[in-house]
Amino acid sequence: MEKQLASLLALLPQAEVIGSADKVITDVTADSRAVVAGSLFICLKGATVDGHKFLAMAAEKGAVAALVEDVPAAVPQGVTLIKVADTREAMELVTPYFYDYPGRKLRMIGVTGTNGKTTSTNIIRLILRKAGYKVGLIGTINIMINDEITESHNTTPDVVDLQKTLYAMCCAGCDYCVMEVSSHALALKRVAGIEYDCAVLTNITQDHLDFHKTMENYRDAKSLLFEHLTDGNKPNKNAVFNMDDPSSAIIRERTKANVLTYGEGHDNDIYPLSFTVEPKHMQLLLQTPVGEMDLELKITGEFNVYNVMGVIGAMLAEKIDKNIICSVLDGFDGVPGRFQLVEAGQPYTVIVDYAHTPDGLENVLKTARSITRGKLWVVFGCGGDRDNKKRPLMGALALELADNIVVTSDNPRTEDPELIIDEIFTALQNVPEGKHVTRLSDRREAICYALAEAAADDVILIAGKGHENYQILKDRTIHFDDKEVVMEYWSDKKC
């Protein structure tokens, strides 16, 4: 892939160009470590790092042009500077163009919401593949291009990485891209240049208030996906809404796309006629626009009833055959770290789940309670450098819904883990008789404590990290996997 620099400059008519425009651009990057010969280097000003400081390094590695907001005293030899008011906005224009707008060539399905995105997108991918399409997926756990899998670092990558990934999907012959679309990505315009065909809203509950500040701002960020759904030239855009979530009624009024709805009410396009939740599976009978769907699912939990309905809405919007949808749903056995049962030969049930929001924790605790014959344990913490308002809320939910609560660390990041736990404990002061609260900041120790103390018929929910295989502690990241800790404990009864 290459473009003439002059053609990129046509997108930035207000830019001041210092140097020759007669150059060929072979790559676009905002990471100085990724610069190659012929790169356009984008100098971004971040919260802690200013990309302008790496301009000289980028020049040494072969950058031939750079987007800047500030012109340095000494312009690197051979580098054309393109001075703009906002390099981030310029990046949003230039990058999709450089990669020939891959998000307009693929059929794009975006799933947004606080919870349920990963499960929903993974099921959609499998259904589309069963229907004969080549499919890419971008999500929290990984990025998939047909059968090629790479680890993901953000729910939605930055603009450059995202466009590069979509371009790779086009090169691999993909028909579809299924994406988890985060509120950060929408607010920061990471999805610039992408034209979605179908968008699904799972739910909106408290999360990311460290970034959005208010729930209204958070909802409005999610709403952008639907407000701009009909932008562009693709026909027949579809929006799928969970009408049991209050935000859906508001956002629905902001889209001009075709609308499909799901929820408990029989006035929805998709609604449950009956469902039975069992410890390891559930039966679900749904009414849909193409008739009843009778499902025997290998996943469980009322929250998954909603995920399944949202998936069906998207797939019916894409005209996928009902029988294909049902066959994939019946065979789907979940994704790592989403209400994942851990079997290590123990006499009780252990569940690992990514729940890290009040709503997510409430949902999985209620499902865990429904399958608990003994005591319900929960081991959880809250992430550092993130929304601290949810910490007491999660503590209160744990106390309400579990019998034995073990409060520990999640990813404390730069915060003191003990102070995070202190904030959770503001909701754990008045412990009812018969319930027990334990505080162990070492996550391995906390998990092992629950594993050692639980009795037959108990259920242990280890919440917060799910699929993650790391823990972020101040200035270092260590290997840590909740499931591995359980397996190791039961292999030699020690941690």
Model-flagged regions — what are they?
Residues 1-93, 97, 268-276, 296, ...:
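N-terminal leader/targeting and accessory segments in enzymes
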Residues 18-28, 91-94, 157-160, 179-185, ...:
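Short gly/ser/thr-rich secondary-structure transition/capping motifs
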Residues 40, 65, 198, 238, ...:
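Well-ordered beta-strand positions
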Residues 64-70, 239-243, 379-380, 403-411:
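Short internal beta-strands
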Residues 68-71, 181, 203, 409, ...:
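Short secondary-structure boundary segments
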Residues 72-78, 198-349, 426-433, 437:
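Acidic, Mg2+-coordinating active-site environments of NTP-dependent enzymes
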